[in-house]
């Protein structure tokens, strides 16, 4: 599964502190950062919605691994750094697909 994080940085150093520790916390539960990015431009979008300036895409082995990351008591002080170090945070999870057939109601690859 993938977790897509879109956000703006708050005017403090909390997300910087979060980022120094988060790689280990994510890795502990089998996750890995697939991509990091800063907004380059808006190609098409809803004019009523401001784009977020930062993007982090994390791959995780399962929804259970994601929940274990969120609920790990060893890192309970970590999540407030992310929450208070950002603004306008959007966070979604997506299941992994080999191609788009499942979206269209078709058979899975290899079935």
Can you annotate each of these PLM segments?
Residues 1-73, 94-111:
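Short S/T/G/P-rich N-terminal loop/turn motif that feeds into the first structured element of a domain
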Residues 76:
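Nucleotide phosphate-binding site architecture
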């Amino acid at each position: 599964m993938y977790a897509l994080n879109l956000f703006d940085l708050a005017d403090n150093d909390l997300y910087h502190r979060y980022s120094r520790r988060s790689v280990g916390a994510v890795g502990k539960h089998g996750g890995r950062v697939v991509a990091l990015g800063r907004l380059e431009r808006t190609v098409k979008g809803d004019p009523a919605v401001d784009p977020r300036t930062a993007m982090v895409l994390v791959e995780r082995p399962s929804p259970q691994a994601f929940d274990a990351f969120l609920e790990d008591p060893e890192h309970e002080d970590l999540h407030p750094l992310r929450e208070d170090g950002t603004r306008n945070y959007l966070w979604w999870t997506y299941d992994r697909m080999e191609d788009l057939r499942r979206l269209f109601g078709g058979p899975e690859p290899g079935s």
